[in-house]
Amino acid sequence: MGSVHGWIAWGGGLHGSDVEESEGMKKVRKVLEKAFSRKLYDSEVERIRTFEKELCLDTRVMIPFIFHGDRVVALPTTRYQDVDKSEKKYVEGVVMQLRRLVWRLMVWMHVPGGSSWIESLINEVFEATVSRDSDPVSLYKGARRRSGIRLMDLVMEVFKQNVSMVSEFGQRLARSAEDRMQGIPGSLSPEERKKEEEMLWKIKEHGERLCTKERQEEMVRAQKIICDVCAYVWEKDEDRMSFIMEVYSRHLCLKIVMPYTDIEVPLISYIDHHKLVSTDEKYKSVDIMAEVFKQAFIEHKGIDDESINNAVREVRERKRLEEMREMEERKRREEERAKNEEELLRMVEREEREKREKREKREESKGRGKRGAGEAKEESKEEDGKEEEGVEAEEEESAEVPLVETAVGGARRKKSLKGKRKGDGHHYKIHSRVLRWKRSAEKIKRELDKGSEERWKNRSIEEIKEQKKVHDIVEVSELIKSKECDRFFFRTGKYMKGGSERWKMVANGILEEGGEKKVGKVEVGLFKGERGESVVYHLMFRPTETERAGMVGGSSFGKGDDVDEIKKEESSDMSGFRYPPGVRCEMTSNGNEFRIEYRNPKNTSEVLRTLTILRIPEI
């Protein structure tokens, strides 16, 4: 969502796919340039042209979340009565649009050169049918049900209601495409006529497929799988944060492209329906479907045989590790139980021995005179007194010994029995491969050309300057070492690579430069140093469009990176880092945003670029 591809509008006629810039393209260009407050780059215009030439008949799915600003106001499992009172009217406004939104994603299609006749057909069928069905707001409120229904159930009800319109639309679409084949102008060249006929034939076949019960059931079932998986992923602690951050990232993209919308509609995403449904039928496992969904939605991978096999392996490996952990836990509990039984047996034996010794002493004292008995009694009291003094001394000694705990990064601090000392932040070291980006582009290039990382060699100065914009953000370290860190960054699972244990910290961010805003992730890559300290070896802002294209290391949330080997000795404490004199960088934080403004060293009133790191969405 939010990319140039996502906002190609319908317009103009079916003919004219070879025209330099169609009416539809002009419309899209105008919308995007207004949203970005700038002219589109040549590469972006070329992307629109490429997309305009593609016939796309893929049905979409809806991600059942409702955002309002930086808050999630409705989850898949949220009922109307559970919505915050201050957000109810807003949620009603979103729900009111569900019928039309679901309808458009069910019959979504893009035809090269524009297709106003298809757009008109979509609207005609909807307007003629929508009034027959119940109001989605009333349905969500659950007037007849005390508890109401969940948001995901509401989405499914709307899908089922809209299915009745799909057959009518498919029939009319197929007839219209056939009529247009008969009316292709004779002025077209044989090659143009062939292209037109092939395109219209595909549209006709698509319309006929929409009329089949199998295709309609596949639509509904695919959405049901998505709803169930979203709810399932949300309930898993280890997946919830990465999921909501990805949803929020796409939501931000949508807001930047369409900043003038009052209602923030749920996200629409493309996922191959046939692959989704067939995988569910084959494995019948919500764990596997959740993994497939995460790879497609969170890690920006398509659903193909390879990704499905990867998902199956991942789930099976996870279950194997869980079983091993359970076995180890059972073994630990059994060993603990055996140890406790052994200790209990020793205690019983000790008590029996003590009783026996006391009994023997009493019998011995009876054979002595009264004087001997009195001396034995005094001696026993003295021994008991010494034992009590020993216990008191032992307790005092243990109270004075402080406990030692290790802070993040290997720094050590004392902790008394009264409680942990407050105010301690996180401690990290910064690797030289991160610090190098604060140098000039020329120095960075010389260092990279001499370095061991092949992918960075022989880059042009222009490329280095572009990379410096997204890598020269070492000030982010001020946030990650602060107590506020966990409000902004999510920690991913650990993995092994190059002989080191690694993990990531990820936050949503917006990079502004020259009037352009880019939504993306702020990535912090870390590894465990030889002394146990945490070392930052990777730091960058990754634009969402780059992440989805599978460039530069893939997904922010994926377990992996493109750095093969790290020279562990090349790291330093970042506390002493300062930019050269004359360079000014301002950092501000209001609890919801951590903002870094990079200024012109020759004119500090001029802001060159701004990186804003956003708090994890409020739930």
From Swiss-Prot:
Report biased composition (Basic and acidic residues) as residue ranges: 350-384
In what ranges is there compositional bias, type Acidic residues? 385-399
| UniProt feature, compositional bias: Basic residues | 411-428
Stretches the record annotates as Disordered: 350-428
Q: Which Pfam families match?
A: DUF1609, DUF3654
Task: State the family it belongs to.
Answer: Belongs to the UPF0329 family.
| Name of the protein this chain belongs to | UPF0329 protein ECU01_0100/ECU01_1510/ECU08_0030
This protein's species is Encephalitozoon cuniculi (strain GB-M1)
Species classification: Eukaryota, Fungi, Fungi incertae sedis, Microsporidia, Unikaryonidae
